[in-house]
């Protein structure tokens, strides 16, 4: 099966300046992500960046690079620009892998592409089971709710579904016994759909939750959710995250 991985790599970061270029075990962070995408069996891996320093660094380790605008409001807008510039066919499967996830398991990159290939939808993603009360009530852990066919009903930062009769005694054991899902921020799209997605006006719902995928649901698209074969470790958002990843990859 053919699929293309696009890795958005934005230069500006309020918490970690030059984040994609930060050294981890002798390599820039973006190279670790690129290597994981290669290991996933992608037909093509493209780094999409808005800065010449990232472009030069990526080309030096052999990556294909597409320069994009620095005015995009989301990673999906950057994907759409790459699809247009590279003239990627509408039926091509695109996997969006974040440029700050050097520990992403290659198996889930290929899994989300295969998931989309099997389903008659334009967008697919992955989730893992929630097992702790702390995660359930953590707004940074996005919850996903799917129907019997694995189609997304909703994504939220709130605990969904809400256990009305167990709110007072909700503990880790109860959470683990239910089918609560934590969304993993990896997506596969059909390339033509990405262009449609960015043509839609942003919705109040996605802005309220700060969850971009809600735009697709609002406009009536289906998103297929599959349980990930391997739970990924967290990406790099803070200096503490960076130091932890450096220790793991040392």
Curated annotation (Swiss-Prot):
- What pathway or pathways are given for this protein in its record? Nucleotide-sugar biosynthesis; CMP-3-deoxy-D-manno-octulosonate biosynthesis; CMP-3-deoxy-D-manno-octulosonate from 3-deoxy-D-manno-octulosonate and CTP: step 1/1; Bacterial outer membrane biogenesis; lipopolysaccharide biosynthesis
Per the record, what are the reactions this protein catalyses? 3-deoxy-alpha-D-manno-oct-2-ulosonate + CTP = CMP-3-deoxy-beta-D-manno-octulosonate + diphosphate
Q: Which GO terms describe its molecular function?
A: 3-deoxy-manno-octulosonate cytidylyltransferase activity
Pfam families under this entry?
A: CTP_transf_3 (PF02348)
- Superkingdom: Bacteria
Q: Does the keyword Lipid metabolism apply?
A: no
Cell compartment(s), UniProt: Cytoplasm
Q: Which SUPFAM superfamilies match?
A: Nucleotide-diphospho-sugar transferases
The protein's predominant localisation is cytoplasm
Q: What is its EC number?
A: 2.7.7.38
User: InterPro entries, from UniProt?
Assistant: Cytidylyl_trans (IPR003329), KdsB (IPR004528), Nucleotide-diphossugar_trans (IPR029044)
Query: Which is a GO BP term held by this UniProt record?
Result: lipopolysaccharide biosynthetic process
- Give the matching CDD domains: CMP-KDO-Synthetase
Q: Which UniProt keywords apply?
A: Cytoplasm, Lipopolysaccharide biosynthesis, Nucleotidyltransferase, Transferase
NCBIfam families, per this entry?
A: kdsB (TIGR00466), PRK05450.1-3 (NF003950), PRK05450.1-5 (NF003952), PRK13368.1 (NF009905)
Question: What this chain does, per the record?
Answer: Activates KDO (a required 8-carbon sugar) for incorporation into bacterial lipopolysaccharide in Gram-negative bacteria.
Q: Which family does it belong to?
A: Belongs to the KdsB family.
Q: In its UniProt entry, what is this protein called?
A: 3-deoxy-manno-octulosonate cytidylyltransferase
Give the organism the record lists: Actinobacillus pleuropneumoniae serotype 3 (strain JL03)
* Gene expressing this chain: kdsB
